[in-house]
């Protein structure tokens, strides 16, 4: 029991740190997306104003200007897609490390407390449920919303992530802690 008491605080601090990092990453991703949208609208309005102020020229000159505008728009849009995709990939990696850390926490607690499991049979599930179930359910709900909404449909290399079944990640927890796994499966359905 002393080992558990000495082990749980640093791991709990790491879990809390990752939780705040995920919140910060979500805020940064939202800011970048809104900034890209604002820049796109601003550049589009500038382009419209410049076209209104220009005098009418020859037809050939107009076609060249249109082609140039299309090339700039395509280049900027492809660059914006790349930035957005990189942010999503980094955010997914952060989610993955957060999941691995929490899973390691549960496995460590299970193997350390296994000799005493018959003694604290009624207290250990209550401890797990009260202290970590809310964090895990919020993590899986955030992960589900990330894969369903943030991953853009035009990204072909990220399209398989949209069909990811989160129940496969919960199966180790279902085997170790049925009361936790059942609640997590209900939240990920």
UniProtKB/Swiss-Prot annotation:
> Which ranges does the record mark as transmembrane?
2-22, 93-113, 116-136
Primary location: membrane
Topology with respect to the bilayer: Multi-pass membrane protein
Q: Which UniProt keywords apply?
A: Membrane, Transmembrane, Transmembrane helix
Source organism superkingdom = Eukaryota
What compartments host this protein?
A: Membrane
Identify one Gene Ontology CC term for this UniProt entry.
membrane
Q: What is this protein called?
A: Putative uncharacterized transmembrane protein C16E9.20
What is the protein's species of origin? Schizosaccharomyces pombe (strain 972 / ATCC 24843)
Q: What is the lineage of its organism?
A: Eukaryota, Fungi, Dikarya, Ascomycota, Taphrinomycotina
């Amino acid at each position: 029991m002393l080992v558990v008491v000495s082990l749980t605080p640093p791991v709990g601090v790491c879990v809390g740190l990752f939780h705040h990092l995920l919140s910060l990453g979500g805020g940064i991703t939202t800011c970048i997306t809104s900034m890209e949208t604002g820049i796109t609208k601003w550049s589009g309005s500038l382009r419209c104003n410049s076209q209104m102020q220009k005098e009418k020229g020859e037809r050939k000159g107009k076609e060249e200007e249109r082609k140039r505008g299309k090339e700039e728009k395509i280049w900027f849009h492809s660059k914006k897609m790349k930035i957005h995709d990189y942010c999503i990939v980094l955010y997914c990696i952060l989610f993955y490390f957060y999941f691995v850390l929490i899973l390691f926490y549960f496995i460590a607690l299970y193997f350390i407390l296994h000799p005493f499991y018959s003694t604290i049979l009624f207290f250990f599930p209550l401890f797990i449920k009260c202290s970590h179930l809310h964090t895990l359910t919020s993590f899986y709900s955030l992960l589900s919303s990330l894969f369903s909404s943030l991953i853009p449909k035009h990204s072909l290399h990220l399209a398989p992530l949209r069909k990811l079944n989160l129940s496969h990640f919960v199966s180790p927890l279902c085997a170790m802690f049925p009361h936790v796994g059942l609640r997590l499966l209900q939240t990920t359905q």
